[in-house]
A protein has these predicted regions:
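N-terminal accessory alpha/beta regions
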Residues: 45-66
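Short, acidic loop-to-helix structural element flanking the phosphoryl-transfer center
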Residues: 59-114
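Active-site neighborhood of HAD-like aspartate-dependent phosphohydrolases
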Residues: 2-45
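Nucleic acid-processing catalytic cores of prokaryotic defense/repair systems
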Residues: 19, 27-31, 103, 118, ...
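Substrate-recognition "cap/lid" segment bordering the active-site pocket of phosphatases
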Residues: 113-115, 119-169
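Long, low-complexity, Lys/Arg-enriched
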Residues: 157-173, 181-182, 186-609
Length: 609
């Protein structure tokens, strides 16, 4: 219909622009809540005032000023309430993506105007349109300005006259059955009725987050990674740290330690919303720097393997290095040959594998005792004692468990609570030993679908949460202080990408709390929805920007998030799939399928991906 028309007219509210509340009258409730007025009474008064103003002036559309004049007797601050209503309209209005896409298409080759029956003034409507990034229209025709309405039909006649068009040359698009469809049709104007999707009856502000992002997110031509950080990572990290803050307040915990390395970004986000009540500290620890010293406190190989699980694809020589040992330390062992050192644990016979693990446990205990002294000194220096919380990305609890063993072997009293993004499958090993809570879900209290969804994106999340420095190996004394000894930083080349994503996320937090200091009443977990959507159905742009990033660590086989690999080479393709960090994205990129998550679910059972 657009292609056959010379003049295209769009309705504004509930067509190009939506409100994040169920009904327009809910805006009045929000104003009442802001001024601590009885919400139901003010909403009723505001509606009655509008009806009275319309009865008083039947010549055309009324103005907001006319409505609030009828409220002055009951509300002495009526003028202030009117400005609050305008400000609330700015806040709750957001672009309807479905219709703005149609609007942009029409703007390419047609004369486009906006036609609305609305009591808000032209400057206010123009500001709402600007906030919603709706531009390119030729003219704005408002009933409040022209004293003509679509409902009466005279506003359409005015539009035709002003644009020098005949009725059959015009198309009007809007949501109201009478004023946007039947009336223009009766004037020989082509009309299309848009039916907005129904909003859920049990929710007041369902699309608050999506509406905010639609209004505030950087433009498409902005830096891709910053925009991704703002629209996807930002809500996710905000939801996580808001949940942490709520929990800390509820349980009267002031001291918080953020575990390196993911904790660097988490602390940066937490500091945006935290007040002076909390003592936030960044703690240089790692799985290696905690679990190796903790081995000094245990007495069996099974406990050793809980702390230092050995993966089949890791070489023997690399595992020795991770433990802070050298191959020469095992020179007296019969298995210590170059051929064996270069094998992966998956290539070893079971008897030889057990012998090597037993030797490692014996040797590392000696190393662990030396490292434990410095680690305890570092923990005392950082005041890791009394009642405190520890925060990490996740997943299984080995670091918190190791810290528990280390602190238990000291004389310092402690009461530790841990926070994860989620508790994953291996958490069962430590669930009876540590106190820990998951933001998205706790171990054993999650649906298989959500568990699978998060599992599919673990490598992407770990990359996005990465710090600006290498992992902590151990500790050393320097100038009277205990300092972390850091490994080489593996993400130096791609850190600008990480930083851009994280900067975008922090910008989101600042913007969101600036507009909604109380979080807009959105449950904390709901903020993870944009991230879950990306994990469930990765957009092609996201795959192409992240797929070729190498996320390998621990000296393993190179792992790319979702590298391009032709299916025509099956063995290579299978190997690439098994080694990919983000398998759903890998499947979608290489198979061009919209069912990548379902395929991942099936293939994971086969390949144990």
């Amino acid at each position: 219909m657009i292609d056959q028309s010379e003049l295209v007219s769009f309705d504004i509210f509930d067509t190009l622009v939506s409100r994040m509340c169920k009904t327009p009258a809910d805006v009045f409730t929000l104003v009442a809540q802001q001024y601590e007025l009885p919400a139901e009474q003010f909403q009723t008064d505001r509606i009655q005032a509008e009806n009275a103003a319309r009865e008083e002036d039947r010549s055309g559309e009324i103005r907001l000023e006319d409505i609030y004049r009828h409220l002055e007797q009951r509300y002495p601050n009526a003028s202030e309430l009117m400005q609050a209503e305008i400000a609330m309209e700015y806040r709750v209005c957001y672009p309807n993506g479905e219709m703005t896409a149609l609007f942009q298409y029409a703007c390419e080759n047609k004369t486009v105007v906006l036609t609305s029956d609305m009591y808000l003034s032209e400057p206010v409507i123009e500001k709402i349109l600007e906030n919603c990034r709706i531009s390119g229209y030729r003219k704005l025709f408002l009933s409040s300005t022209l004293k003509k309405t679509k409902h009466a039909g005279d506003l359409f006649a005015h539009v035709l006259e002003a644009c020098h068009k005949k009725p059959e040359q015009m198309l009007h698009i809007g949501d109201n059955l009478k004023s946007d469809y039947l009336i223009p049709k009766s004037k020989s104007i082509r009309a299309f009725r848009y039916v907005p999707p129904k909003k859920k009856p049990d929710s007041f502000c369902v699309p608050v987050l999506d509406a905010f992002l639609a209004r505030k997110a950087p433009q498409e031509d902005s830096d891709f990674y910053h925009t991704f950080g703002y629209t996807v990572l930002g809500p996710a990290i905000y939801g996580y740290v808001s949940w942490i803050k709520d929990f800390l307040q509820k349980h009267d915990i002031q001291k918080v330690f953020f575990f390196a390395r993911e904790g660097e970004f988490i602390k940066r986000a937490f500091d945006c919303i935290a007040d002076q009540t909390f003592e936030g500290h960044y703690l240089y620890v790692s799985r290696r720097s905690l679990t190796v010293p903790a081995i000094a406190t245990i007495h069996d190989v099974a406990s050793f393997l809980k702390y230092r699980p050995i993966r089949d694809r890791v070489k023997v020589c690399d595992q020795i290095e991770k433990l802070g040992l050298k191959a020469a330390d095992f020179s007296e062992c019969s298995w210590c040959r170059e051929e064996t050192l270069q094998k992966t644990f998956g290539e070893l016979q079971d008897a030889e594998k057990q012998a090597i693990i037993g030797s490692m446990f014996q040797k590392v205990q000696q190393q662990a005792k030396r490292e434990l002294v410095l680690l305890k000194a570092y923990l005392r220096q950082e005041h890791v004692n009394q009642k405190f919380a520890v925060v990490d990305l996740g997943w299984n609890g080995s670091m918190q468990s190791a810290l528990t063993d280390i602190l238990s072997s000291s004389s310092e009293p402690f009461d530790m609570t841990g926070f994860f993004l989620a508790q994953r499958d291996e958490y069962y090993k430590y669930k009876d030993k540590i106190r820990n809570f998951g933001y998205l879900f706790n171990y054993g209290a999650v649906s298989p679908e959500e568990n699978l969804l998060l599992n599919s994106g673990t490598s992407l999340l770990e990359f996005l949460f990465s710090a600006s420095h290498g992992s902590t190996i151990q500790y050393a004394e320097k100038d009277g202080r205990i300092c972390p000894v850091l490994d080489q930083y593996e993400f130096a080349e791609v850190y600008p990408i990480i930083r851009a994503c994280q900067d975008g996320a922090i910008d989101f937090i600042h913007d969101f709390i600036g507009e909604f200091p109380d979080g807009a009443g959105i449950p904390c977990k709901q903020f993870f929805s944009p991230m879950y959507r990306v994990l469930q159905q990765p957009p092609q742009a996201v795959i192409s920007h992240f797929g070729d990033i190498c996320v390998s660590d621990m000296n393993e086989t190179e792992i790319y998030l979702a590298e391009k690999c032709p299916v025509s080479a099956p063995k290579k393709w299978i190997r690439a799939f098994v080694n990919s960090g983000w398998k759903v994205a890998f499947l979608k990129r290489n198979l061009k399928t919209s069912h990548a998550m379902a395929m991942y679910s099936l293939l994971r059972k086969h390949f144990n991906g």
